[in-house]
Structure formats: C-alpha cells, structure tokens
C-alpha cells in the first residue's frame, strides 16, 4: 500500500517526506521533481519569500543509481530562510527574550492559529502557524512528482491549471487533452488557458495587492489514461472520488471540490447530466463527460476532471480584527509575509496530490512490488477491458 508522511515547519531547517509503496525499478528523474518545485514557487502574485527559497529535492534513501529499490524513499527540501530563524526555531535550546521576538498572540481570521492554539494549548501561536503554513506543500509536491513519474510509466498523465482568479473566469474553452492544456498554460505566468485575459488578471492582482487584500480562485485537474474500474463501489471508503476529494480538501485553503460538471450538474435534469454509452473495437466509451470520468466510485475510462475551490489567502496586510489570546484585548491580527494570490502554485499542489491518490489506487489494484510486473498486469487488464 502506498503511503507517505511529511514533517517539518515553515521556518525550520527542512521539509522531510517518507514514501512507502513505490515499486522497485522505477527510474527517478530528479530534474522533474525540481521543475515542479520551481513551478510551485512561480506565478504572478507571489510574495517575497519566493525570492529567498530555491527549492531543490534531496533523495536520502530508497533510490540507488536512479532506480527505486522498493524500500521507503526519503525526500528532503531545505528551507534557505531557516538561516534567519535558526534561534527562533531551534528544536532544543530554551526560549529566551531574543528567540521569542516572533511570538504570535494575535490569531489571524481564516487561519489555523486560534483553534490550533486552543486544541494544543499553545499560547505562542507560532507553534501552530509554522506547521499549518502552505510551506509544507513543497515537500508534498516532491512526493507527488515521484507518483507522477510512476503514473507516466503506467500510461497516465495529468495537469493542473487555473480556471478562475477571483471573479474572473479563465477557462473559456472546451475540455482539451493534457498535452494541449500544458502547451497553453506554459505560455503565461498564471497557468490559464485564456491568453487574452492575462493582462486583465495582472491588473486585478496588482490592484488587490495595493489594497492590502488577497484573491482565491478555481483550479482544475485533467487526467488522461486511467483505465476503467479503478476504485470500487462496494464500500464508502474505497470510492476513488471520495479519496480524491479528501486529498484535495487536505490542501491548505481549499474550501470546495467537485468532479466533472460538479455543482452545476444539480441544476439540470438527469437526461442532460448523464454520459451515454457507446462501443467499438477498443471497448466502451461515453459520448460526453459530465461526470468527470468517475461513476459509482470508479473510473470509467474517460478523462478525470477534478475541480477545487481555493479561498483567498487569510493573511492580510489590511489586517482584520482579532482577540489577543494573552490579554483578551481586541487588536489587529498578526501580519506574516504572504502572497496576494497563491492560486498558481496551488494548481501545482492539487495536480500532485491527485497524482498521489491515483498512484495509490493503481498500486492497490495490482501487484506493485516491481514496476515491470505492475506494467504487465496493467496491460493485461486493459486488454481484458477491451474484450468485455
């Protein structure tokens, strides 16, 4: 079973991940991981921290001479900014007046600060925000890219892109293939399909930054190449759409997830929302894809369409009212270094967490000790589906 765990704080020395369940014999391209890490740091509307960090992955275990061993894989992404926080974030030295200078007592509305402090009895809310920070998604992207490389070896490709920023819809075209989407979104720094809206959105982001405010948006992930029948209908926790939804909602700032036409499908009669079935020499197909490639908790062979709604970043330079957890006085919330919008990097993160769930689903469906064996079994299964 494919599992992973991450550890580390935003201004600690590094983010660390251990992945278990990647088959032996998978060629790992470190450059691909680093390319995704760089993409996560990019995009219009990012804050100043991205000028400090230059994320690169280090592989400390589970890979030898470029090939996975089948044993747990350890990944590390260093935090360069830790050099400025080493005493404040020191794991063993006692707290002093000097290293408590960045103590946080004024929780930010919309963040984990207050409720996390209440739950774990922290009076210095930095103990909460350091882990709840989206900085954790850097190491999660590294995990996801390993899974994307596994998926590619199994004939599965995917891409995440930005559908909307604030009130502006940027997805004005019909669904496209993964390769077509990639070609389009790499032509701008917003990962959007509508090239004619780039300048408008730059202006919107600039105006929002000057106002001390932030923006959210919508993200879409498209997946090509998943065979039918991955996932299950027999138990609630084996439904692939439920697993994908949980993974998406586990990403910082996500407040909604849908599959295919999603919430919009509820507005239409069933005759306009289902995907009619056809058959040819290659097997069964759907004449449309309103359901986003998932029926009954299982893939149906059509492209997967996963949508995610991201709230505006709650760290505001135009700080909102809050209550000091020590004095109980009404004050302005703490202000941490932040972005105006993180919708672009979030699309990379969502792409990668979807990849993790799909890799889990495929390795759970077949013998995944060795890549070649997994490929043989998947090829035989695809052939079986064609003959059904």
Swiss-Prot record:
Listed Pfam families: Chorismate_synt
Reactions it catalyzes: 5-O-(1-carboxyvinyl)-3-phosphoshikimate = chorismate + phosphate
This enzyme's EC code(s): 4.2.3.5
Residues that hold FMN according to the record: 131-133, 252-253, 296, 311-315, 337
GO cellular component annotations of the record: cytosol
Record-level GO BP terms: amino acid biosynthetic process; aromatic amino acid family biosynthetic process; chorismate biosynthetic process
Associated pathway: Metabolic intermediate biosynthesis; chorismate biosynthesis; chorismate from D-erythrose 4-phosphate and phosphoenolpyruvate: step 7/7
InterPro entries for the chain: Chorismate_synth, Chorismate_synth_AroC_sf
Bound cofactor: record note: Reduced FMN (FMNH(2)).
Record-stated family: Belongs to the chorismate synthase family.
Primary role: This reaction introduces a second double bond into the aromatic ring system.
Identification of the protein by name: Chorismate synthase
Lineage, top ranks: Bacteria, Bacillati, Bacillota, Bacilli, Lactobacillales
Gene field: aroC
């Amino acid at each position: 079973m494919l599992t992973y765990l991450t550890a580390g704080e935003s201004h600690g020395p590094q983010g660390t991940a251990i992945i278990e369940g990647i088959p032996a014999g998978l060629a790992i391209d470190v450059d691909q991981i680093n390319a995704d890490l760089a993409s996560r740091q990019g995009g219009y509307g990012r804050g100043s921290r991205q000028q400090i960090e230059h994320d690169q992955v280090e592989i400390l275990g589970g890979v030898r001479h470029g090939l996975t061993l089948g044993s747990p894989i350890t990944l590390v992404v260093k935090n360069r900014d830790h050099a400025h926080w080493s005493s404040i974030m020191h794991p063993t030295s006692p707290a002093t007046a000097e290293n408590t200078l960045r103590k946080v007592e004024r929780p930010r509305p919309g963040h984990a600060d207050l409720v996390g402090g209440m739950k774990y009895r922290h009076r210095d809310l930095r103990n909460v925000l350091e882990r709840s920070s989206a900085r954790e998604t850097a190491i999660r992207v590294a995990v996801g890219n390993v899974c994307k490389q596994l998926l590619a070896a199994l004939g599965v490709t995917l891409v995440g892109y930005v559908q909307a920023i604030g009130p502006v819809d940027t997805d004005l075209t019909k669904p496209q293939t993964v390769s077509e989407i990639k070609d389009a979104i790499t032509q701008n720094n917003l990962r959007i399909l509508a090239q004619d809206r780039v300048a408008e959105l730059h202006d919107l982001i600039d105006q929002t930054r000057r106002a001390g405010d932030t923006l959210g948006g919508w993200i879409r992930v498209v997946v090509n190449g998943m065979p039918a029948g991955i996932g299950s209908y027999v138990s609630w926790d084996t439904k692939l759409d439920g697993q994908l939804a949980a993974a998406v909602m586990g990403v910082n700032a996500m407040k909604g997830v849908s599959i295919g036409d999603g919430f919009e499908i509820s507005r239409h009669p069933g005759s306009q929302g289902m995907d009619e079935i056809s058959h040819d020499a290659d097997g069964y197909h759907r004449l449309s894809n309103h359901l986003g490639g998932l029926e009954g908790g299982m893939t149906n062979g059509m492209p997967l369409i996963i949508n995610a709604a991201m709230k505006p970043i709650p760290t505001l330079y135009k700080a909102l009212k809050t209550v000091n957890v020590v004095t109980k006085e009404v004050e302005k919330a703490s202000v941490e270094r932040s972005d105006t919008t993180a919708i672009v990097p979030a699309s990379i993160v969502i792409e990668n967490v979807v990849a993790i769930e799909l890799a889990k689903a495929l390795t759970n469906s077949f013998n995944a000790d060795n890549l070649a064996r997994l490929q043989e079994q998947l090829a035989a299964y695809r052939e079986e589906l064609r003959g059904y």
